[in-house]
């Protein structure tokens, strides 16, 4: 009987410890994470494109939120990583492509993937039509549970895309 009581006590202690160190319920919820990224960006100001700036060795339109240029600025995406243990990216629309201008997604060489393009996949199709995409996706060779949202200027024109991903 003592063994059973000890086992029950240890099981309860283990379960309590797990609950104490568990992440918040929304920590791995892609829709909650993308909502947080979008709220952080909106708090800065309205999105708009103004001029150009090199990212990852290529020219791209400069995406601003309010007066803050997002190209090569990693404060917001790094804050999302810290809060949600998620990858985050802001893309700018460049013609028919979406170019990473701010990201914590790393290339195989270990560098931020700025200057790379959103693949022409189901996420691309959805955001190009102004729709959200949430689901499994490959990002620079790694599988993620991800969400993508179109970023629209005050006139409703798509000027970019926000992305978050939780590694599978």
Predicted regions and their residues:
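Short N-terminal helix-loop-first-beta-strand/juxtamembrane motif that initiates sensory/input modules
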Residues: 33, 38-51, 77-98, 134-136
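Extracytoplasmic/periplasmic sensor domains and loops in membrane signaling proteins
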Residues: 71-85, 102-141
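N-terminal secretory signal peptides that target proteins for export/translocation
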Residues: 1-8
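Sec/Tat signal peptide C-region and signal peptidase I cleavage site
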Residues: 21-27
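Hydrophobic beta-strand positions
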Residues: 90-92, 105, 150-151
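Extracellular/periplasmic ligand-binding regions of membrane signal-transduction receptors
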Residues: 28-70, 105-109
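Conserved beta-strands of PAS-like sensory domains
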Residues: 64-69, 143-168
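Bacterial N-terminal signal peptides
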Residues: 11-21
């Amino acid at each position: 009987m003592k063994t059973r009581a000890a086992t029950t006590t240890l099981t309860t202690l283990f379960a309590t410890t797990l609950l104490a160190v568990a992440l918040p319920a929304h920590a791995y919820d892609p829709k909650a994470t993308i909502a947080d990224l979008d709220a952080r960006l909106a708090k800065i100001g309205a999105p708009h494109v103004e001029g150009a700036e090199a990212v990852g060795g290529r020219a791209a339109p400069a995406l601003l939120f309010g007066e803050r240029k997002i190209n090569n600025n990693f404060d917001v995406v790094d804050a999302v990583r810290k809060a949600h243990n998620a990858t985050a990216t802001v893309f700018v629309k460049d013609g028919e492509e979406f170019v990473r201008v701010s990201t914590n997604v790393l290339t195989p060489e270990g560098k931020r993937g700025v200057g790379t393009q959103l693949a022409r996949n189901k996420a691309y199709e959805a955001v190009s039509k102004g729709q959200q995409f949430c689901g499994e996706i490959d990002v620079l060779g790694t599988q993620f549970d991800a969400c993508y949202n179109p970023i629209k200027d005050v006139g409703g024109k798509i000027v970019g895309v926000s992305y978050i991903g939780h590694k599978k």
